[in-house]
Amino acid sequence: MANREVVVLSAVRSAVGGFGGSLKDMEPSDLGAVVIKEAIARGGVDPKEVSFASVGHCIPTDSRYAYVSRVATINAGMAMDSVAFQVSRLCGSAQQAIVSSAQ
């Protein structure tokens, strides 16, 4: 397997909220899309040029959120053939997403 360069384009996190709090009416994929769009904007690249997104997501509350990272990447403007990798590891989700991407 050829070595591939992993580039951290930028790091952005969502707002911090409590369960059932001010973000309760926002779909997780919509919140994720906002975060991904901002990460891409800070990186200064075209969303269609990003081929892989690693997303940390904590505690999906409904089975329809099983593919939240995929929906979020598409809603953020990434290409349909891009890869969306989702990690759900409670408080360690974001850090595990970075580690797993590097592997």
Please provide the spans of the model-predicted regions.
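Active-site-proximal alpha-helical scaffold in enzymes
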Residues: 88-103
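Conserved "HGTGT" condensation-loop signature of ketosynthase/thiolase-family condensing enzymes
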Residues: 1-82
